[in-house]
Amino acid sequence: MSRLKKLPKQPEVNIGTIGHVDHGKTTLVEAITGVWAARHSEELRRGITIKLGYADAPIYKCSKCEPHQSYSTEPTCPHCGSPGEFIRAVSFVDAPGHEALMATMLSGAAVMDGAILVIAADESCPQPQTREHLAAIELAGVKNLVIVQNKIDIVDEKRALESYKEIIEFVKGTGAEGVPIIPVSAQHSVNIDAVLQALEENIPTPSRDPDKPPRMYVVRSFDVNKPGTSVETLTGGVIGGSILQGRFEAGDEIEIRPGVRVEKHGKTLYEPIFTEIVSLHAGGRKVKEAQCGGLVGIGTLLDPSLTKADGLIGNLVGKPNMLPPNRSELVLDSHLLERAIGTKELVQVDRVNKGERLLLDVGTAITVGSVVSMKNDIVTLQLARPVCAEEGDRAAISRKMAGRWRLIGYGIIKE
C-alpha cells in the first residue's frame, strides 16, 4: 500500500529505474518509496509499466549504525531507534521495460540525473531491453549509475553468482563498468539500505543554475476534476515535470511550447499557450517556489481539456518570450551506432536515406521526422509534430525494424 507523505524538502535529483520488462523496476521503486508507480488502469490490468511512473523518497542516515545499515527512508533508524539525519529527497522516474515502449523510456531519460539498472538474477544477462536501456541512457548523457541484481530470493546461490558474473561481463567497456552491483530482493525489501547507500555515493545532485531563465520539461499532464464537476468549480489543468534550470513561483506567467495544434487557412500549426501558475507541488506538499531538480506539479488556469490524458507531454515550459523557437525542421549532426540495439540478434545500422521516416526523442517530446537531405553526417528532417528545442540539444534516433522502433543513434541539433 502507498505510504505517500510529505518530504522535509523538495526532491533535488531524478533517478531513473531502467531495464528489461518484468525485472522488478516498479517493485524496487515501491520498496524504496512505498508508492506503486504504475497507477494507470491498463498497467494495473496487465502488470507492466506503460507510462512513466513517479514517486519520491527522503533519505536519512543514522550516525550510530554501520554502513550500509545506517541508510533508510525513515526519520527514526529502523535498527537502533536513533533519530536519523536528513540527507536529501529523491524523485524516481520508473521507465517501462517493454520493447514496444522504448520511445517512452527515452523521453524519461531526458529528466534523469542518474539511473538504477535493474537486472533479474533468474534470467540470463543481457536481455534485449537491458542492453537497449543501458545504451539509451548513455546516448542521453546520463553517466551516474547503480546496478541492482534483483530477485535473489528466487534463485539459489550458484545461479546468483552466475548472474553476477554475467553482469560483470555485460558491462565491460560500457559506462556501467565498475559501478556497484547490489544484490536485492525488492519483493521482500532485502538490501534496500545498501541501495540507498549506493545512490548517495554514486549519484550526486548535479549543480544547476537557479538564476537562469526557468525551463521545465513536461512529462505528465492531468485533468484533476471528477466527472460531473460544475463549470463554476472546475480546477485548471495540471502539468508535471522537472525544472532544468531557474525556478518558478506561484503567480508567475508562463509560456508552453510548442503548444496546441490549430488549423489555419487549411494548414496545421502549433501555437504556444500562455497561462498563470496558481499552485506548485513538490515532495508531496504545496510550495510557494519550485527549484531545479526532482519532480514538480504546476496548477494552472488552463482549460483542463488541454491537459487531460497527458495531452501536453513533450512541451517545454518557461517565462513568456524566453523559450527556444518551435522547430518543424531539424538539422542534426548524427552519430549512428554500429549495430541496432534491442533486437535479440545485433543488426548492423545502415546509413540514413532520403525519404526515410525516423522516430526522434527530443527532451520529453516524441515525434516522427522524414529525411529530406543527408550530407556526410548532417541529416535534415521534416517533423510531423514540431518540437521546442535549441542548438546543442540532443535527439535520440530510432528506426523501424521488423515492426518495432529500434534505437540506432543520436544527433546534436544544429541551427
Give names to the regions the model predicted.
Residues 2-103, 112:
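P-loop NTPase switch module centered on the Walker A-proximal segment
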Residues 7, 169-312, 316-319, 323, ...:
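Conserved catalytic-core segments of large NTP-driven translation/proteostasis enzymes
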Residues 8-34, 88-91, 111, 117-119, ...:
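Helix-rich terminal scaffold detector
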Residues 14-17, 155-157, 304-415:
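C-terminal effector modules of nucleic-acid-centric enzymes and ribosome-associated factors
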Residues 22, 28, 47, 94, ...:
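Residue-level signature of catalytic and energy-coupling elements of molecular machines
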Residues 87-91, 95-101, 109-133, 138-162:
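Conserved Switch II/interswitch segment of TRAFAC-class P-loop GTPases
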